[in-house]
A protein has these predicted regions:
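Extracellular loop and loop/strand-boundary signature of outer-membrane beta-barrel proteins
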Residues: 10-14, 52-60, 104-112, 140-144, ...
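Repeated loop/turn-to-beta-strand initiation elements of outer-membrane beta-barrel proteins
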Residues: 34-39, 79, 131-135, 165-168
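Residues on the lipid-exposed face of transmembrane beta-strands in outer-membrane beta-barrel proteins
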Residues: 26-32, 69-73, 87-89, 121-127, ...
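Residues that define the transmembrane beta-barrel architecture of outer-membrane proteins
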Residues: 3, 20-24, 61-67, 81, ...
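Predominantly the C-terminal beta-signal and adjacent terminal strand-loop region
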Residues: 153-202
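Transmembrane beta-barrel strands of outer-membrane/channel proteins
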Residues: 30, 39-43, 85-91, 125, ...
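Outer-membrane beta-barrel translocator domains and adjoining extracellular loop/strand segments
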Residues: 1-5, 49-55, 96-105, 147-153, ...
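Short glycine/proline- and aromatic-enriched beta-strand/turn motifs that initiate or cap beta-hairpins
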Residues: 1-44, 194-196, 200-202
């Protein structure tokens, strides 16, 4: 929503690919003993067009920048598995644009940008299924009214080691956020499969 004007956008994975203007994601993890640190960043720029009545259309644009960093510690270890708890911060920067127009001319245009910082807590479970295959699951929650009203996410990831320093990743990720302040509204989630490549520094 922008300045009290709301538009509902629902897109499948194929829809996102067709309306995506730009995107990028980067993750860094560091481990030392029972402690670990991670940084995760994502940028996504989407736009879409819909029709609200005969001859009247809406153009919706959403640009999302999300950065998060957290520190965790192992609280339980087994022979080939471990359970971590972590705490950190998730930074959001969202720009919403809404244009109401006819086929030939714009009628109204609304634009707003909002940034905030959410506290974050979560758990991370990882296990080695074979010498080359491992599985990781992460669940986190945050906001709690200090930034957004609420945000939570989850990820499940399989990693296949192809060399001493490299591996291929395939998994599923979900992220939800509910934020509202001074007419700026964001009540949305994104989810889907991902494929990635991991390179270890040493």
């Amino acid at each position: 929503g922008v300045k009290g004007h709301k538009a509902r956008v629902s897109q499948s994975f194929s829809d996102i690919l067709s309306t995506m203007d730009a995107s990028g994601m980067l993750t860094f993890q560091g481990h030392k003993g029972k402690q670990y640190f991670f940084f995760d960043g994502m940028y996504l720029d989407l736009s879409d067009t819909g029709q609200i009545s005969a001859g009247v259309f809406t153009d919706v644009g959403v640009t999302t920048t999300r950065l998060q960093a957290a520190w965790g510690v192992s609280v339980k270890e087994w022979e080939s598995s471990s359970l971590h708890v972590f705490a950190g911060l998730r930074y959001w920067n969202l720009k919403n644009e809404l244009t109401i127009r006819t086929a030939s001319a714009p009628l109204r245009h609304f634009s707003d940008t909002e940034s905030w910082l959410d506290p974050l807590i979560g758990i991370r479970f990882s296990t080695r299924l074979s010498p080359n295959l491992s599985f990781t699951a992460i669940v986190d929650a945050g906001g709690f009214g200090m930034g957004s009203d609420f945000t939570w996410g989850g990820m499940a990831d399989f990693s296949w080691r192809i060399s001493e320093r490299t591996s291929l990743e395939i998994g599923y990720r979900y992220l939800y956020v509910d934020y509202e302040k001074d007419g700026f509204t964001m009540d949305a989630y994104n989810d889907g499969l991902f494929i990635g490549f991991t390179w270890k520094l040493k």
